[in-house]
From Swiss-Prot:
Cytoplasmic topological domain residue ranges: 216-330, 397-402, 455-458, 742-756, 817-822, 874-881
A GO term for molecular function: symporter activity
Originating gene: Nckx30C
Keywords, sorted A to Z: Antiport, Calcium, Calcium transport, Glycoprotein, Ion transport, Membrane, Potassium, Potassium transport, Repeat, Sodium, Sodium transport, Symport, Transmembrane, Transmembrane helix, Transport
Descriptive protein name: Sodium/potassium/calcium exchanger Nckx30C
Pfam families: Na_Ca_ex (PF01699)
Length: 881
């Protein structure tokens, strides 16, 4: 450090104007900074003008004094040291070059070095004063611009035409949002801010470039007006210490180095932000709350932080993670992803092995019909993970992860599940129009109502109640489903000709038994009844129409397609450990194919014999095949080996038809749709293969606690404790859903993925895996209507129960509407409604048959929906709503 020399009175008189002017400039800047910290914008403008004039005078006086000074030394004085700090050692002097210049001019090298050093000190201090003034001026301009933008946005938000636009936070927008117009700000006037913001940025870069030695110096820790940064060593210091003016030096670790503490060192500080939006949740907890207007809706005392889409976002109530942010970015997030997948398996096990069987006992105790039970209890059993995910999203994580999960799960169930059923079904399944029409009608109504309620990004309690009322209406409709279906079909088929072609005309030769026109149903009496199609012509009153009846959902009879599905629901645990394989149900014997063709197809009426006197009505008969004995083969989904008696024909038929049926008594193997009488209880036995043993070990940490705490209602002893299983299953589902959402949020934050996107893709697919497996198994058994109805029916439960119940509880408890923050979610729901229309149109185009072409079409629609929804979420496509 260079030592000051003794000054003469003449030299001090020459330096006095510069010293006094610099002191005035420093005092003006300090007063300006304090007014800026107090947010006194009225006095800030006047102080800015005064400080600017003082800075200009100081710069002029300093330059004049330096030019008049011709002595060999530039003296130090106490006044000069109080007016400006000595510069850091970063402003080094090239003594060799200056020594050469000094020798040419006749000056001593040491005197010349001190002269240049002190000139640089004064000039740099004036430059710093000017820099602060420029930055404060830019801050004032930015604050005024943001205030006007917020005022325009709030005014526009009150208008009906632009009610969807929400105002930005009163504490200001983040620097990232201001400097990057691609940021998802809800402000409608963001485009008009681009030019002044870029101009401000250019000026800031220019003023930062004036300090040549500042770029190499380490930046001090960021400080915020009105609050402290947890990364700073002095968290409790007052902001006046940080803004202590020109005369308060901040010493560094170097012995002879000093550093000027600039009040604004980054873009966020330049614009006067009180909160850093890139901080962790722990850092946000130390921030000072904003205005009373912003905190009016925050009734739980949770600190607000700025969000891209809404005015306030509450801190999630999740515990602190075991890993730091750096560790998560370096690979620890993989453990969270594995944990989320593990929770998918846990939810599937508790729903399939404990929750659904307990619901089956409740249905049996209450005597509820299959239609109502399928729409209520069984739908709740399959959609329990989505319901609890929505509850956690509203009350714990305070985001739209529940909405994203339910919307994504709905699309997954409609498109992906139906596509998988069409691809992996053994035969081409025929669908009945009534169940699809019924479920899609209620689902369309619920989606349209939900889109209308999302128009202002808020859900009130009465809106949630209306959504739940739609579900009550759906359950009431299912109570009289058979009567309504019969009435509607009578109205449609009244005085109309309905022709069902002969089944053997619909199939190529040699593949008759593989037709989906023929359905088999096991009768209680131990017989297999094969149903044939019919041809009906309108005739005069009193004509006998012996229409075919049965349990199958086809033709003109009632469908009766909605069943509880509990008997068909094979758990994920059984698929992983036990012997069930959904893709290998056993082979059908070729002889059974031939006999099945004879028994069910050749009896059909290929042509009706006209009679004199008008139109005739002819109907197909039932071919009743009595079973002598029935033995199950030793296979997982075994075939039925049986011996047939002579067939008997029921109904009045002409003798010329009886001659067409030639069935010989022979032993054959026939495959019929399986209906399990009693579900098997959970088996904890040690598996016999290495793969199953490995799976058993992996799921044992989940399975053993549930097996110890939840009675198995599929056993006679555990059936008495079904309330314990029911309540305990709900507790386990809530715990697993909490862990799933927590770890998914951590993984999404680490990968910079919004919660809505995580719910729309990853969580939606994971929570729908059990329904996918069940639907594929049901479709391979030949129940296409049940597979489609269960997919659409679970979506009705999700939208009308999974979403409104948490919203209704929130409105009752806190008396405030639920804020819906996602911009693209409204458009995603709209596209979901369009996809539902496309599904119905696709099924109609494929003539109500589930074939592989329909499956590939469903896959194409699913990936198109996901792609468009992601573009809405990331503002690649602007959502017009």
């Amino acid at each position: 450090m260079l030592q000051p020399t003794t000054c003469s009175k003449q030299q001090q008189q020459r330096q006095q104007p510069a010293i006094a002017t610099a002191a005035v400039g420093g005092a003006a800047v300090q007063e300006l900074l304090r007014k800026a910290a107090a947010k006194d914008h009225g006095a800030l403008a006047a102080a800015t003008a005064t400080a600017t004039a003082a800075s200009t005078t100081a710069t002029t006086a300093t330059a004049a004094t330096a030019s008049r000074n011709s002595s060999n030394t530039w003296c130090h004085s106490d006044d000069m040291l109080s007016a400006g700090r000595s510069r850091s050692s970063s402003t080094t002097i090239d003594f060799n070059s200056r020594r050469r210049r000094g020798r040419l001019r006749g000056h001593a090298p040491s005197d010349l070095a001190m002269n240049k050093q002190h000139q640089a000190t004064i000039l740099d201090e004036c430059v710093n004063i000017f820099k602060r003034l420029v930055l404060l001026t830019l801050k004032t301009i930015s604050a005024t611009t943001i205030t006007k933008a917020k005022t325009r946005s709030r005014t526009a938000a009150q208008l009906p035409a632009t009610s969807a636009a929400s105002a930005t936070s009163s504490r200001g927008a983040s620097a990232e949002q201001l400097l990057h117009p691609s940021s998802r700000s809800r402000c409608r006037s963001r485009r008009c801010l681009r030019l002044p913001i870029y101009s401000i940025l250019l000026l800031c870069l220019t003023t930062q470039g004036l300090g040549l030695g500042d770029a190499a110096k380490p930046r001090p820790a960021k400080q915020h007006f009105g609050g402290s940064n947890s990364n700073s060593p002095n968290q409790n210091q007052n902001h006046n210490d940080v803004l202590g003016g020109v005369g308060a030096p901040s010493q560094t670790s170097g012995e002879d180095e000093a550093e000027i503490m600039y009040p604004f060192q980054s873009g966020e500080q330049m614009f006067g932000l009180e909160e850093d939006q890139e901080q962790d949740p722990e850092l946000n907890s130390n921030a000072v709350p904003g205005s009373d207007e912003d905190n009016a809706g925050n009734q739980r005392g949770i600190n607000d932080t700025h969000n891209d889409n809404s005015t306030t976002t509450k801190t999630p109530l999740f515990p602190k993670d075991l890993f730091t942010k750096e560790q998560l970015e370096n690979g620890a997030v993989i453990l969270h992803i594995i944990g989320v997948i593990y929770m998918f398996v846990a939810l599937a096990i508790v729903c399939d092995e404990f929750f659904v069987p307990s619901l089956d006992v409740i249905i049996e105790k209450l005597g509820i019909t299959d239609d109502v039970a399928g729409a209520t209890f069984m739908a709740a059993g399959g959609s329990a993970p989505e319901l609890f995910t929505s509850v956690i999203g509203v009350f714990v994580s305070f985001d739209d992860v529940g909405i994203g999960t339910i919307v994504g799960s709905a699309v997954f169930n409609i498109l992906f599940v139906i596509g998988m059923c069409a691809l992996f079904s053994k035969t081409v399944l025929s669908l009945t129009w009534w169940p699809l029409f019924r479920d899609c009608s209620f689902y369309s109504i619920s989606l349209l109502v939900l889109i209308y309620f999302f128009r202002d990004n808020r859900i009130f309690w009465w809106e949630a109640l209306i959504l739940f009322t739609i579900y009550i209406g759906y359950v009431a409709f299912m109570k009289w489903n058979v009567q309504v279906e019969t009435c509607v079909k009578k109205m449609i088929t009244k005085n109309k000709v309905t022709r069902v072609r002969s089944t053997d005309q619909l199939m190529p030769a040699g593949n008759a038994a593989n037709s989906s026109e023929t359905s088999m149903a096991t009768q209680p009496g131990g017989s297999v009844t094969s149903r044939a199609a019919s041809e009906t012509r309108s005739g005069p009153p009193g004509s006998s129409n012996a229409g075919a009846t049965g349990n199958s959902s086809g033709g003109g009879g009632t469908s009766g397609s909605t069943q509880t599905g509990a008997k068909f629901r094979h758990g994920l645990l059984q698929l992983m450990i036990h012997t069930i394989d959904p893709l290998h149900d056993g082979k059908v014997d070729e002889k059974a194919t031939q006999l099945h063709a004879i028994a069910s197809l050749k009896v059909l009426l290929d042509a009706t014999k006209p009679q004199r006197g008008g139109a005739t009505t002819s109907a197909a008969n039932h071919v009743k095949i009595n079973l002598k004995e029935t033995t199950l083969a030793d296979r997982p989904n075994g075939n039925i080996d049986t011996t047939l008696d002579s067939p008997s024909l029921s109904g009045r038929r002409p003798s010329w038809i009886e001659q067409r049926v030639k069935i010989q008594t022979r032993k054959f193997s026939i495959k019929a749709p399986e209906i399990e009488d009693e579900p098997e209880p959970l088996s904890m036995a040690w598996p016999d293969t290495a793969r199953k043993r490995l799976t058993y070990v992996l799921v044992a940490p989940l399975l053993v606690p549930m097996w110890l705490t939840l009675p198995d209602t599929r056993t006679p002893r555990g059936k008495r404790f079904f309330p314990v299983t029911f309540i305990g299953s709900i507790v386990w589902i809530a715990a697993f859903s909490y862990l799933m959402v927590w770890w998914a949020n951590v993984a999404g934050d680490t990968a910079r993925i919004p919660p809505e996107v995580m719910g729309l893709t990853f969580l939606a697919a994971g929570t729908s895996i059990p329904d996918l497996i069940t639907s594929v198994i049901v479709a391979r058994k030949g129940f296409g209507d049940m597979a489609v109805s269960s997919s659409v029916g679970s979506n009705i439960f999700d939208v009308t129960v999974g979403l409104p119940i948490p919203w209704l509880l929130y409105g009752i408890i806190y008396g405030a509407p639920v804020e819906v923050n996602s911009v693209g979610m409204v458009c995603s729901i709209t596209i979901l409604f369009m996809m539902l229309v496309f599904v119905v149109m696709s099924i109609a185009c494929f003539r109500w048959r589930m074939n592989k072409g329909l499956g590939f079409t469903m896959f194409l629609l699913y990936f198109a929906f996901v792609a468009v929804s992601l573009m809405f979420e990331y503002d690649v496509i602007t959502c017009p709503f």
